[in-house]
Amino acid sequence: MKKIECIILDWAGTAVDYGCFAPVAAFIESFNEIGVPVTAAETRAYMGLTKIEEIRALFNIDRVKVAFREKFGRDYTDEDVQARYVAFQRVLFDTLENYSEPIPGVVDTVEALHKAGIKIGSTTGY
C-alpha cells in the first residue's frame, strides 16, 4: 500500500470561514458604499464565479440595475465593475480576520499531518 505523501486543504470557506461569510459581507459592504445595496442571497447566488464576474452578475440583477440608474443617472460601466472589485478586495482584506477561525479539528489535524511527515498543500477562493 502506498503512503500518503501530501494532502490539499481548501481553506477559505471550508477549513476556515466555513460557509463563506467573509466574501458575502465584503460584496454587501462594497455595494453599500455606493448606495446600491445587494443582499446575502443575491451574492450567494453567484458564488463559484470569479469575484469580478460575480460583481458583473450582481450589477446585472434588474433591481440593482434600476437602483444604480436611479442613484447615478446612467447604466453601470466596466469602470464601475472595476471600482467595486477594488472596493471588494479592500473590504475583504480589512475584515478577513473577523472570519479566520478554523473549524473544530483543523489545527489538530494539521499538527498530526506535520508530525506524520505528510506535506500540506493549500487552495482557496479568497
Tell where the protein language model's regions lie, with residue ranges.
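Conserved phosphate-coupling serine/threonine residues in phosphotransfer and NTP-handling enzymes
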Residues: T124-Y126
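N-terminal helical cap/lid subdomain that shapes the substrate entry/recognition surface
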Residues: K2-V107, H114-K119
